[in-house]
């Protein structure tokens, strides 16, 4: 069960109930009304299904959020395998794996909870590397964005224009927008770390190339033919086939040249996906 924590927190603030969209993996999809037992005395009721997504309402008392975090595990991508029936307890391999995942599958600059997956291009950055970039005169601009379910969902339609991309919550504050506009005005490049950052920046940029402070949900689907307005270069990992992420970088660079680069990466045994290597595209 993977939950949209940011949406759940907003629903909790608005209604007093923690309810959100979830991805449920089960041998059989639970019917609406089914009560799920999640450990730590937490139960969740399935409200409805929307395509691959299930709407779930959680119940757990006053300290629900504390127990939810204690019961939950880091939502690793499905291709990263862990023992499905591990021995539980202090100091066990399962606990050590979980502690390592919570550290490794998180960027050093993360501040707000809410993403269902790490913005994996950011995993390459350390505090020392960020300090070294700043020392060289690189202005690091921070925005808030919560990676959503769309990062896991392949494109299954024949015409990619028919694909419905999931929205992701973001915040671009006044300071970030001002820094980016000032840099662009001075002829500096805007280098986005990760495809979600690309989508957010492009979503907030007008036809004249000026970015505005905003917050909300970004549902911009970028595929070949899109004209970029803000981003000049991208740092990104190697992505799954048939993914919106691969389509985005194909739109930025050129599909055939991207596929040629992927072939070189395979031949040279580069690491792919979340814990893999990154590429710089300009």
Where are these regions (language model features)?
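Surface-exposed, charge/polar-rich loops and edge strands
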Residues: 1-282
